[in-house]
Amino acid sequence: MEDFVFGTLATDNLKLLHHRTRRRGIQHAYQIEPRDPKPDEPITLSVTIGPHLKPARVVCHLNGELLDFEKREMLWDTLVWGYVEKWTLTLAGKPDGTVIRYRISAIEADGRETFADFPEVQTSIEIATSAFFRGESLPDLQPGDRAKGNAFALSVDTLTPPEWAKHAVIYQVFVDRFFPGKGNDWKQPDDLLGFFGGTLWGVIEKLDYIEDLGVNCIWLSPIFDSPSHHGYDATDIYNVAERYGGNEALHALVDAAHARRIRILLDFVCSHISDEHPVFADAHANEDSLYRDWFSFDDSEVGYRSFFGSPRMPQLDYTNPAARKWMIDAARYWIREFDVDGYRLDYAIGPTPDFWTDFWLGCKAEKADSFCFGEVIDAPDVQKHYVGRLDGCLDFFSADALRRTYGFKTWDEAHLERFLERHAAYFTDDFIMPTFLDNHDMDRLLFLNGGDKDALKKAAQTQMHLPGPPLIYYGTEVGLTHEKSSQEGGGIHVSRVPMVWGHGQDQDLLDFYKKIIAERKLRK
């Protein structure tokens, strides 16, 4: 059985496509040194030029000027079977608070101009991944528009990730499955795609439990209006769904949690919304809609760019300034009006590269110590692109290593130790990477290892010694598991079972978690 933690890199063919696409055409992909420039520090931009592009010039479009790159290095790449050029440009240092906005292009001798990043990597990867999971052969590379490219932005500042986040112990609450509250019983839907009735009032009633566990930060699954149980397809990003208790319940939860020195993080989806959202419905039905350019309509089977080809989740096009402002304003609103402490950012690799610079600065303007970390399920070198644009990323690679060792048991502990040492050395201390053993999109670790509680304890003990803040998926600490695999017909929602309370909890495992969390806090 495969885990498929890395969906877009799930097979050798997908990995090969990923690599080859990033070596073709002209790719900048935030190759910046230093990655998070400080005031007055020179900044070097790099691009790679693939075998089939022969530029006479490579230029940076900055403040109405064209600044020339210099060819620095010739590299052989066997996987694209050709030479790849590296070009660089060093910019003078800038004062604190400067946002550098730029584009990069390659100009050939005949005047044809190709803008980075081309080919557009993410679209190609999404289309290929969708085909793989549908059991279809990988499609041809989708090159995109060479005249479009990406806009890039980097902030010169002294901002740093919040110190509190480095010492956090985070608890992931899937709200619909945690606790109903107010004396209500669980609802009885036909399957896990239905609504079970968990609410924010229920979370408030269980704050004693969460605090006693040793947790000082809660990540809530999406709570906005949505037609689904998971909420990753919002129909209103300015209101908490009434089934969770509405805005009143969120206010009450934040106040109650803060009184216990527990932070609250929202799950925020910038990449896409629901096809039932009024903004998209208007854009879809009316070519003259004010919102038409907020989305990328095309001649695909779906008719528009969407989350891995799902017609239910159209993706927003943040080259449109109004769409960008709308989403960032919403993020600022929840921090300003509800005092939330930051965001777990769903599918952070989806929006255009410059979006996160503006998003992060907007959140920091509302609350300097807000914590914004992305779900970036991609290679570590790609995750590094988010240094200086977000506070961190979820650590999918340590999760994969722990699951291979204590779930599938295909790695021994010596292999795990070597990997974790190298992995920690690859990232800086100021890029915060929450660690986890399982989450809402994968099988629980206790299911993978056939109920081996000792192996789960070893995994949790190891997790507590990793640099990043530990993140605990609700119920893992009490032995919650499920019957079917997500990879054998169960679907990715199989782990989203209702939380068990009272005698249904594994008290020995719960006591163990309390112990190792307390020990971590003493070390930190």
Please identify what each model-predicted range represents.
Residues 127-131, 135, 143, 161-162, ...:
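Core domains of carbohydrate- and sulfate-ester-processing enzymes
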Residues 428-451:
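Active-site clefts of carbohydrate-active enzymes
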